[in-house]
Amino acid sequence: MSHTTITNFLAGVIARPQGGNITSDETFRRYRTIVRTSATIGGNEDSRTTSIFHEIGRAVNTKGKALAVAGMEAPLVEASYPTNAVLVEDFIGLAKKYTNFSATFEYSSLAGVVERLARGLAACSVFEDVTSTDLRGNNPLAVHALATYDGPVNSLTSAVFIPRLVNNALTGDVFAVLCNCVAGEGGTVVTDTIELDANTRQPIVPEVGPLGVPGAIVDALRLLGSNMIASDQGPLFALALTRGIHRVLSVVGHTDEGGIVRDLLRCGGFGLPFGGIHYGLEEYSGLPALQFNSAAATAAYVDGIALVTAAVVAHADPGERYNGEWFPTFFDGTTHADTMRRSGDSTEGTAAMADRNRAQLLARQQLFWRPYITALGACFSTAGDISVAERFQCAASHSLGADPRHLRLPSVAPYFWIEPTGLIPHDFLGSVAEEEGFASYCWRDTTRTRPAWDSIVLSGARDTTFSAYHIRMKGARTAWFLAHWLGHPENGLGATRVRQLDPNAVLHPGPCEGNEQVRDRVEADLPLTDYLWRRGQSPFPAAGELLNLTSEWGILFRHVTFTDDGDLNPEHLPAAHEMADTTVTMTVGRPIGIAPGRSNAGDNQARRARTRASVELSAASRRARVFGRPDVGEMPTLTSAPAPIPASPAYDGNRGGEAGGVTGRGNNRSAAPGHASWSERQADGVPVNVTPHHNALRAPPFPRQQGALGGGGNVPLPPAPGAAPPPPPGPPNGPPAGPPPSDDGSSNPAAPVPTAIHAPPAAAQADRAEGQ
């Protein structure tokens, strides 16, 4: 199965690389990402610049440990996959040419070779004397040539066929590094032709020096990438490469528990490699070529992969559902034997808590590995089937040791390794974590604008001095208002006051000296900054920072303060008429190398304990795992009043009447279906025919008459004394007078009107006269 590479996502991750080999455990390669945010205050743009720091150290202190082979009791996991049918036919052709070669290539397993190549590349960025021989980790090199070997060659178990044509004018050292990596994984190399020593009959494989090894490894990785992509195993290739990088390097996490993913990637190993490597496939370009062989260039190349694969963890967080809302994945390591504390209190972690968190993590790990491996495939531009990679990593993760230090906490939100802003686009996967605002804010060299709050509604009246709002903020990370004002030199957050908050619904608040419990902070009318963590390498809140299960906040903003003399002092906040419509614009650069040095990572002092909120959120996770849905009929314990019930119109039966009636408010005010006063009456029964009729206010139209009408209306007035009589109804020689004009303004002539109502015709009057 072939896939077209659309973009090279890993190209140019780091700008201006500095630093090379890491000489001590206290030395870290450091990078700085510049972030600019802006908002409108008083009609003027307010801008500030901050930085995100990333640090990368070494996980081992010698190259021998970095490239050590798996022991006899190492937990290895088989990760074989079906080989592409076209490649199978090509490899089987060798069995027809060489009778001593019994080939079966229906399945292949090259992920272990990819992981060792990645470990060698990472070791080249840490140590300065890595050669191709070091890649096999003191294992013997076994190479069989089909043309010169006089015994049978079996490829069913642990043999990898590597043709000599993997070398060309540009990639002349690929064969050497591939042979040593296969040997380091315990496999045997089979090739078409090779030079043997005349005296010892040992194969002669060239040795590549420290300057040539990094480039040769990258070329070999691109070759294996094209082979595994051809068999629809691009995600497995990306996972194996990621595991190899993080087994040698150590990316410093931005949260206490975020490094647990690094520990999981170091668990287990791949089984013995077997299969064949084809040299004639389309070149894989998802992994950039290494342009320079300097130590700084190699370090920047490897660190770019390490940072991207660590940052995308936040985008793959499967999350929890609580009361219809999405929250980051959360594990509670306490039990009923632990004391229930208030939000804001802190409890020291224990080994028992670490083991309980570990059990929960492994029980739900598949929900994380599925999107994470998909994300790795997108990073390396290697789409394909993720089932083999997912099954392998789920099995390998069970070798995670007991009492992991990253889980030795009362509660953890594990899937936030480092700040992804500047490394990953905000919509990279289309995951729920991205939609809810817990992933990256913005990608490198781009600009993005968002509302300052997810939802904000004015509470009461406002003026130019104070304004209060009901704000929706399920976590500190979802509020872009904090992305701009948190750590701002003008300290605008000091003019905020948290007035309404349910302390029992708050998770992972920050420290506050003198008011440790969240309840006391609300009563003390403290600003929003006293609820947040201490800032370290990232200026932005973490995904698990200051979670609120109700998502509701009542915050008072002081726009102006006055001195004792009446002088006003404008606060660094949007004006009262601007607050509800405030937006924040963010522009992010790419990581820039700075001088290596000691780590500046500090303790964020997050307050963790067994609280009502931690029990509720962790219970939702367990209910979802057991029953398939997180909802439960039990009402959570909160100290805030429920939402007000909307008022409904009064029932007609409660209106009027005499005094003394009982009209309880607890009764239902709406009539039952079918009642005459039911507001939604429905038609029913057999339809009736249409019948013309006259209602009580209408009558058949009668023609109007001339002269007086009955009832005293329209009586002609008598002529004045000495005046001439009135003229006849019509002119002497003209037609009789017509009816009055139509009331509706119509110009159509009306029908003739008789002179009197029920007047007999002229012929009938003549007959009557003759009869008399």
Curated annotation (Swiss-Prot):
Protein location: Virion
Listed Low complexity bias regions: 743-766
UniProt feature, compositional bias: Gly residues: 654-664
InterPro entries, alphabetized: Totivirus_coat
Primary localisation category: virion
Biased composition (Pro residues): 716-742
An annotated GO cellular component: T=2 icosahedral viral capsid
Residue ranges of the region described as Disordered: 593-772
Alphabetical keyword list: Capsid protein, T=2 icosahedral capsid protein, Virion
Pfam families: Totivirus_coat
Family statement drawn from the similarity comment of this UniProt entry: Belongs to the totivirus major capsid protein family.
Function (record text): Capsid protein self-assembles to form an icosahedral capsid with a T=2 symmetry, 40 nm in diameter, and consisting of 60 capsid proteins asymmetric dimers. The capsid encapsulates the genomic dsRNA and the polymerase and remains intact following cell entry to protect the dsRNA from degradation and to prevent unfavorable antiviral responses in the host cell during all the replication cycle of the virus. Nascent transcripts are transcribed within the structural confines of the virion and are extruded into the cytoplasm. Binds and removes 5' cap structures from cellular mRNA.
Protein name: Major capsid protein
Natural source organism: Helminthosporium victoriae virus-190S (Hv190SV)
